[in-house]
């Protein structure tokens, strides 16, 4: 499987983007996804500094599917953890297409979607859907990897 090669850019502080654009009011719906992804990256990097959470962090986007991607792909040894971030209060099957597609990649031990809802869910094909608090708890307790 070939992956697209263009990089994904994140600001160190997602609030800097808003300030640079002079968006000083309430966060708009169109901004929430990017801000939540940036926040998630910051949290992952901070935990990696303290506990060697991963050896490599990237994102995944196959060449053959333009609309398919996974926000974060963590590698530890030969194991991969795929993480998709959704700034939505509900999970839908359409939001999980990237996690479904990456299931064909060898070595993926967990496919995880984060969302703004309150329930932990699991799809029939094994994708786990967690609220943000469950993600933070897993990081704190060193349980992100299965």
Identify the role of each PLM range:
Residues 1-78:
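Accessory nucleic acid-recognition modules appended to NTPase machines
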Residues 18, 66, 91, 120, ...:
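Flexible, glycine-rich phosphate/dinucleotide-binding loops
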Residues 24-25, 44, 77-78, 106-109, ...:
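Intrinsically disordered, low-complexity Ser/Thr/Pro/Gly-rich regulatory segments
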Residues 75, 80-90:
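Active-site ExK catalytic segment of metal-dependent nucleases
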Residues 86, 114-117:
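Short beta-strand/turn micro-motifs composed of small residues
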Residues 88, 93-107, 111:
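Short, charged, amphipathic alpha-helix that recurs within catalytic cores of restriction-modification
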Residues 117-146:
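Domain-level recognition of nuclease-like catalytic cores that cleave nucleotide substrates
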